[in-house]
């Protein structure tokens, strides 16, 4: 089976947005117009094709990012833009679009992060009433981190209170981005009829009857002529800045470049992230989706337009790039694992170079071989078996044994490890206990499966109580995982109240000499270590420095000292939470020819850490959340008063449309159940988002309470 679509006709894009901006609906429409799903699934009917987990359909939010492959033919820019829509697409090459739908809820930013890692471009969807919302900012920053070229679709312009121009301004104010407006809305709110296409200077109007597949080109309405001319001029001026020759020609003649040249310039600026093209419409009312697809083909990068992926060679640690080409050695990144009710475990994989057929590949991170048996192309919830996949493809591989999220798959003869993804540490935890003996075994399997799928979800056992503790990014995150355990794995469990994931930290530098000796006939145990333990910067982790001179502790025992100290730090000192962010300097020690061993030095390390904690003093740290509440003016005082009562530090307020946004740092311990209280004192009119910001010291009186509660 040869490659069907050349690489330059691939588009790997993500659709990202704030919760409720209409992202899944937009994806649904894209699938409908590209002929992938024959009937439109509505989110509020619980029938959207991309949201295929039962809970997503019940809650109406997207939790997992499903990858879907679809196809589209764009217009021919050299033909008369007013000719019939069919004629404009005739004879044009088909493009293959892989869409990754991402969740917009802040508890699932991990999903967004891992999708952005494998995309080449992204479409940010905004709500036409609210403009840029907190989660949109988070996602935007994540996209900046991965240098993803993107464009914006201002959606829901059929809603009462929708304001396209306010949204464009909010892209400048809140994201610090440079919007390049390509379309203006015709009509507003319930009277939205279509859009003005500024590249071709024409109106596009949808005939409402048949789900928006039919539209026609019209002259630009007279009442929009001035506005269209003004925005067209801005568009041309920004576009010609991308190319010196075009700029010169424009300055000399004052004539705008033709449509084909304009598109080329806009494409260049989009890829260089000089600006973000802005489109508009209403996905729900089927208006503006075809121009969005055209823009994806015209302006979003193909795998050849983005820098080649970098990696390191496992043996030598030298850096190497793998260009997007079928002739390069095979390399791919496993970016998501899902359990499929029909196929079992599926590993979603982005192929960066080479081709993949059935047989063996190497997981270079784990250094294990994996067998490729069954490969699938996913169309939201139905699937197509394939025998071969190429550079640029996003495929699902069934039945992999050892591969987890973020692992590299490659050709065993040419191993490489691609850049890994970073996953945040969880900030909230709760205990789960199986209801019956039968549930006990199933629960272990279920939790391991869920943890393999989601790297921001961790499972551990409390050594003292024997309870199983699950940790995640927020209440909703853990809620959904417990719910999935019940539905998918039929495990009934009692769930404890959510607990804060506190941390411990050293109060001051301390020098400790610890000797472990056990003599009792025969071979004994002996180890001595002298260490200096110093509190570090927040977020530095544990740093171990070996400063042993002259072999006072033999080389082979030094890792044991480090291991013992790290393990002891993990189990904490004050109330059993990990001690974080400090530096250990191992400066001296002693050993015995017969009695010393790796085990003896590990015990020495543990003892040294215990003593360092005891003598250096321990402070309790708590996770501080960045909270943003958007509330009507009337409740502003109540909201601020309430946040203050939760030990919050107000950072500022600013007006957003007709509402006020309050930003504050609040300890997570004081935010449980906030959603219900906020709802009750604002009559459900305020909403909030929160995300982890940093760890900070717990005030003495609160620390005392925590100790008593947890002791």
Swiss-Prot record:
<dbReference type="GO" id="GO:0005737">
    <property type="term" value="C:cytoplasm"/>
</dbReference>
<dbReference type="GO" id="GO:0032790">
    <property type="term" value="P:ribosome disassembly"/>
</dbReference>
<dbReference type="InterPro" id="IPR000640">
    <property type="entry name" value="EFG_V-like"/>
</dbReference>
<dbReference type="Pfam" id="PF14492">
    <property type="entry name" value="EFG_III"/>
</dbReference>
<dbReference type="InterPro" id="IPR027417">
    <property type="entry name" value="P-loop_NTPase"/>
</dbReference>
<dbReference type="InterPro" id="IPR047872">
    <property type="entry name" value="EFG_IV"/>
</dbReference>
<dbReference type="InterPro" id="IPR020568">
    <property type="entry name" value="Ribosomal_Su5_D2-typ_SF"/>
</dbReference>
<dbReference type="InterPro" id="IPR035647">
    <property type="entry name" value="EFG_III/V"/>
</dbReference>
<dbReference type="InterPro" id="IPR035649">
    <property type="entry name" value="EFG_V"/>
</dbReference>
<keyword id="KW-0648">Protein biosynthesis</keyword>
<dbReference type="Pfam" id="PF22042">
    <property type="entry name" value="EF-G_D2"/>
</dbReference>
<dbReference type="Pfam" id="PF03764">
    <property type="entry name" value="EFG_IV"/>
</dbReference>
<dbReference type="InterPro" id="IPR005225">
    <property type="entry name" value="Small_GTP-bd"/>
</dbReference>
<keyword id="KW-0251">Elongation factor</keyword>
<dbReference type="Pfam" id="PF00679">
    <property type="entry name" value="EFG_C"/>
</dbReference>
<dbReference type="InterPro" id="IPR000795">
    <property type="entry name" value="T_Tr_GTP-bd_dom"/>
</dbReference>
<dbReference type="InterPro" id="IPR004540">
    <property type="entry name" value="Transl_elong_EFG/EF2"/>
</dbReference>
<feature type="binding site">
    <location>
        <begin position="101"/>
        <end position="105"/>
    </location>
    <ligand>
        <name>GTP</name>
    </ligand>
</feature>
<dbReference type="InterPro" id="IPR041095">
    <property type="entry name" value="EFG_II"/>
</dbReference>
<dbReference type="InterPro" id="IPR009022">
    <property type="entry name" value="EFG_III"/>
</dbReference>
<dbReference type="InterPro" id="IPR014721">
    <property type="entry name" value="Ribsml_uS5_D2-typ_fold_subgr"/>
</dbReference>
<comment type="function">
    <text>Catalyzes the GTP-dependent ribosomal translocation step during translation elongation. During this step, the ribosome changes from the pre-translocational (PRE) to the post-translocational (POST) state as the newly formed A-site-bound peptidyl-tRNA and P-site-bound deacylated tRNA move to the P and E sites, respectively. Catalyzes the coordinated movement of the two tRNA molecules, the mRNA and conformational changes in the ribosome.</text>
</comment>
<dbReference type="InterPro" id="IPR005517">
    <property type="entry name" value="Transl_elong_EFG/EF2_IV"/>
</dbReference>
<comment type="similarity">
    <text>Belongs to the TRAFAC class translation factor GTPase superfamily. Classic translation factor GTPase family. EF-G/EF-2 subfamily.</text>
</comment>
<feature type="binding site">
    <location>
        <begin position="155"/>
        <end position="158"/>
    </location>
    <ligand>
        <name>GTP</name>
    </ligand>
</feature>
<dbReference type="Pfam" id="PF00009">
    <property type="entry name" value="GTP_EFTU"/>
</dbReference>
<dbReference type="GO" id="GO:0003746">
    <property type="term" value="F:translation elongation factor activity"/>
</dbReference>
<dbReference type="InterPro" id="IPR031157">
    <property type="entry name" value="G_TR_CS"/>
</dbReference>
<protein>
    <recommendedName>
        <fullName>Elongation factor G</fullName>
    </recommendedName>
</protein>
<dbReference type="GO" id="GO:0005525">
    <property type="term" value="F:GTP binding"/>
</dbReference>
<keyword id="KW-0342">GTP-binding</keyword>
<keyword id="KW-0963">Cytoplasm</keyword>
<dbReference type="InterPro" id="IPR053905">
    <property type="entry name" value="EF-G-like_DII"/>
</dbReference>
<dbReference type="InterPro" id="IPR009000">
    <property type="entry name" value="Transl_B-barrel_sf"/>
</dbReference>
<feature type="domain" description="tr-type G">
    <location>
        <begin position="8"/>
        <end position="304"/>
    </location>
</feature>
<dbReference type="GO" id="GO:0003924">
    <property type="term" value="F:GTPase activity"/>
</dbReference>
<keyword id="KW-0547">Nucleotide-binding</keyword>
<feature type="binding site">
    <location>
        <begin position="17"/>
        <end position="24"/>
    </location>
    <ligand>
        <name>GTP</name>
    </ligand>
</feature>
